[in-house]
C-alpha cells in the first residue's frame, strides 16, 4: 500500500486499493501507519509504502519531479492490476445501486444465488441480484440484525436481532407490508450469543448458543417439515399459522466454558471454546478435546497465549484448524498432519471461509 504526501512543492493526494492472494488488504487512508512528515523535511515528491500486518511499517521514497513520481505510481498500479488478475477466483458484484447508503451487518444468499437477504441496523432487506438497479426492499423491520441463515429446503429464514432468534417462513414475508410479516414470525430463543445451522447425523440442525464467561448452553433444534405433515394430516396445515412452530428441540446440553463458534461434522459437533476445539457426540453428549494431548508436536498450540479457535474445515480426510494466530492440519485422531505445513497470519483474522480447492 502506498500514499502520496504533501511536500513543499504542493499537495497531491493519491490512493491505491489492492488485495493479495492471501487476502490482506493494501488500502490507503492518509497518514495511516506512519508519523507525519514535515513539509520541509526533504525536497521532492514523497511516495509512502505502508505494510499492513502485525509487524507493519512504512517506507517513504522521494522522487525528484512530479512526473517521475507519477510514473512510479503508474507502474505500481499496473503491477497490482496484473497480480489481482492472476489470483482472481471470485467476481465481485454490487448488491445495491451506487450511492445507496448501506451498512450491511450480514448477508445470506438463496435461490441459487439469485436473491440475497441483507441484514441492516434497521431490519432485513431483500435484494434480487438479477435486477441490481433496484435498491434492497425492507421485509422485516427488526433492530440491530446481527446474523441470518436460510434453511432453503424448509423455506425458513432465521434471524438473530438484539440477542433474540426468530424464524420466518418465506411465504410469510410480504415486502409490501413488512409490519404484517413480523406478526408471522416465531421467537425461538432469547439471550442468544450466536447460532449456526448445518447437517449432522443426517439431520438439518440449528444450534442456538447462550455463552457466558464460565459456561455455555447449547440448544439444538431441527425443522418441522410443515408441508409434508400437512399432506398427511390436512387439518394440521389449517391449525398451524404461517411461521409458527417451525423448529423443535432435538438436544440441549451444557459445557463448562465460554464458546465462540460451532462447526458441524458428520456425526458430531465441534465447538470453539477458550480451551480450544471441543468435540461433542450428539448421541451421548460426551465431550472431549479435538487435539490429542499425547502428540508432542502440538506443544506450540498449548504454549500460545490468547489463542482463539475460529474455524475448522474437512479437506481430503484431514481437518484444517484455523485459529486467530495460525492454521494447521490434524487427522481424525487429533494428531498433527502435514508436519511441515503451518500458516501464520500477518493480520488478525476474525472469520474464515473455504471454497475448495481454491
Language-model-derived ranges and their functions:
Residues 16, 48-50, 60-62, 106-108, ...:
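Beta-strand cores of modular interaction/reader domains in eukaryotic scaffold and signaling proteins
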Residues 7-30, 82-102, 129-137, 241-254, ...:
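A short helix->beta-strand "capping" segment at the edge of beta-propeller domains
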Residues 44, 48-50, 57, 68-71, ...:
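Intrinsically disordered, low-complexity regions in large eukaryotic scaffold subunits
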Residues 63-131, 141, 147-150, 155-167:
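Alpha-solenoid helical-repeat scaffolds
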Residues 80-84, 121-138, 165-187, 214-253, ...:
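Surface-exposed loop/turn elements that mediate protein-protein interactions on large endomembrane-trafficking
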Residues 1-53, 130-154, 173-196, 296, ...:
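Pleckstrin homology
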Residues 4-87, 155-156, 160-164, 171-173, ...:
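Canonical pleckstrin homology
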Residues 26-41, 96-113, 141-158, 186-213, ...:
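Structural signature of eukaryotic scaffold interfaces centered on beta-propeller domains
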Amino acid at each position: 500500500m502506498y500514499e502520496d504526501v504533501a511536500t513543499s512543492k504542493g499537495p497531491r493526494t493519491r490512493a491505491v486499493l489492492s488485495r493479495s492472494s492471501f487476502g490482506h488488504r493494501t488500502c490507503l487512508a492518509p497518514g495511516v501507519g506512519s508519523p507525519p512528515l514535515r513539509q520541509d523535511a526533504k525536497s521532492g515528491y514523497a511516495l509512502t509504502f505502508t505494510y499492513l500486518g502485525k509487524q507493519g511499517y512504512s517506507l517513504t521514497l522521494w522522487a525528484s519531479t512530479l512526473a517521475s513520481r507519477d510514473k512510479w505510481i503508474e507502474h505500481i498500479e499496473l503491477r497490482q492490476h496484473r497480480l489481482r488478475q492472476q489470483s482472481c477466483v471470485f467476481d465481485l458484484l454490487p448488491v445495491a445501486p451506487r450511492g445507496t447508503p448501506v451498512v450491511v451487518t450480514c448477508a445470506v444468499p438463496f435461490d441459487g444465488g439469485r436473491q440475497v437477504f441483507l441484514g441492516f441496523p434497521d431490519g432485513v432487506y431483500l435484494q434480487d441480484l438479477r435486477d441490481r438497479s433496484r435498491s434492497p426492499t425492507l421485509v422485516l423491520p427488526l433492530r440491530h440484525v446481527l446474523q441470518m441463515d436460510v434453511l432453503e429446503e424448509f423455506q425458513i429464514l432465521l434471524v438473530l436481532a438484539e440477542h433474540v432468534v426468530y424464524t420466518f417462513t418465506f411465504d410469510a414475508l410480504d415486502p409490501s407490508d413488512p409490519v404484517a410479516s413480523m406478526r408471522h414470525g416465531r421467537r425461538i430463543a432469547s439471550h442468544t450469543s450466536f447460532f449456526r445451522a448445518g447437517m449432522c447425523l443426517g439431520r438439518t440442525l440449528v444450534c442456538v448458543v447462550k455463552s457466558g464467561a464460565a459456561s455455555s448452553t447449547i440448544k439444538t433444534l431441527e425443522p418441522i417439515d410443515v408441508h409434508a405433515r400437512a399432506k398427511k394430516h390436512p387439518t394440521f396445515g389449517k391449525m398451524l399459522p404461517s411461521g409458527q412452530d417451525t423448529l423443535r428441540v432435538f438436544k440441549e446440553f451444557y459445557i463448562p466454558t465460554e464458546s465462540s463458534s460451532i462447526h458441524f461434522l458428520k456425526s458430531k459437533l465441534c465447538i470453539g471454546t477458550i480451551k480450544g476445539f471441543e468435540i461433542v457426540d450428539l448421541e451421548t453428549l460426551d465431550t472431549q478435546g479435538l487435539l490429542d494431548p499425547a502428540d508432542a508436536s502440538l506443544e506450540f498450540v498449548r504454549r500460545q497465549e490468547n489463542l482463539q479457535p475460529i474455524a475448522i474445515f474437512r479437506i481430503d480426510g484431514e481437518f484444517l484448524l484455523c485459529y486467530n494466530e495460525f492454521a494447521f492440519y490434524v487427522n481424525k485422531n487429533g494428531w498433527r498432519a502435514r508436519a511441515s505445513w503451518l500458516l501464520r497470519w500477518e493480520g488478525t483474522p476474525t472469520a474464515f471461509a473455504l471454497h475448495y480447492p481454491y
